[in-house]
């Protein structure tokens, strides 16, 4: 069975990668689908995000990376996928994602949404959090793959922050 994991992934985080890896254990193929959203200002171009995701998932044999326009359920039908994967961090994610799952079901009754609870260590993590930390000069090395951390530091014209040592 084919599953689609749609999102903006701007940037992809270790939390996203955790969901992808776990999805790969459940489905024959997982397509990580980057939404082309012209109305949203992005840190990285679509091409950069596709390359970042490909590099971050190269260890997974049953992952494809692509971009799409429009509705995720329409893209899923085009790819003959039966499932949309969504990660859940907190209760507010569930409310939003459940509403979207119900909406998608009215549009395409044959497509199911599968929710994967985020691993505890990533329950606070989002692309927005990563960008906010980086813009204020904090280290994001523990939140994204190393090659993406470097890309982020370049975007904000900053060098990689030095670790803060606990001094007593």
From Swiss-Prot:
- Which superkingdom, per the lineage? Bacteria
Return the CDD domains for the record. PPAT
Q: Which GO terms describe its cellular component?
A: cytoplasm
Task: Set out the biological process GO terms recorded for this chain's protein.
Answer: coenzyme A biosynthetic process
Q: Where is the signal peptide?
A: none
What is its pathway? Cofactor biosynthesis; coenzyme A biosynthesis; CoA from (R)-pantothenate: step 4/5
Q: Which residues bind ATP?
A: 8-9, 16, 87-89, 97, 122-128
Q: Which reaction does it catalyse?
A: (R)-4'-phosphopantetheine + ATP + H(+) = 3'-dephospho-CoA + diphosphate
Principal subcellular localization? cytoplasm
Which Pfam families would you find in this protein's record?
CTP_transf_like
Q: Return the InterPro entries for the record.
A: Cyt_trans-like, PPAT, Rossmann-like_a/b/a_fold
GO MF terms on file? ATP binding; pantetheine-phosphate adenylyltransferase activity
Site note Transition state stabilizer, residues:
16
- Any idea of its EC number? 2.7.7.3
Where does the record place it? Cytoplasm
- Give the binding site residues for substrate: 8, 40, 72, 86
Please give the cofactor(s) recorded in the UniProt entry for this protein.
Mg(2+)
Q: Which family does it belong to?
A: Belongs to the bacterial CoaD family.
How this chain assembles, per its entry, is:
Homohexamer.
Q: Write down the HAMAP family for this protein, in alphabetical order.
A: PPAT_bact
Q: What does this protein do?
A: Reversibly transfers an adenylyl group from ATP to 4'-phosphopantetheine, yielding dephospho-CoA (dPCoA) and pyrophosphate.
The protein's name is Phosphopantetheine adenylyltransferase
């Amino acid at each position: 069975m084919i599953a689609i994991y749609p999102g903006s992934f701007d940037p992809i985080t270790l939390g996203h990668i955790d969901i992808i890896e776990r999805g790969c254990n459940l489905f024959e193929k997982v397509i990580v689908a980057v939404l082309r959203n012209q109305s949203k200002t992005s840190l990285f171009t679509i091409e950069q995000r596709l390359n970042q995701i490909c590099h971050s998932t190269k260890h997974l044999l049953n992952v494809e990376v692509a971009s799409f326009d429009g509705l995720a359920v329409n893209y899923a039908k085009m790819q003959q996928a039966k499932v949309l994967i969504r990660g859940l961090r907190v209760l507010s994610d569930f409310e939003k994602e459940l509403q979207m799952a119900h909406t998608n079901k009215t549009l395409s009754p044959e497509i199911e949404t599968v929710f994967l609870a985020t691993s505890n260590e990533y329950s606070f993590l989002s692309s927005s959090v990563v960008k906010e930390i980086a813009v204020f000069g904090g280290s994001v090395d523990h939140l994204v793959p190393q090659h993406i951390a470097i890309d982020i530091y370049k975007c904000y014209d900053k060098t990689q922050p030095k670790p803060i040592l606990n001094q007593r």
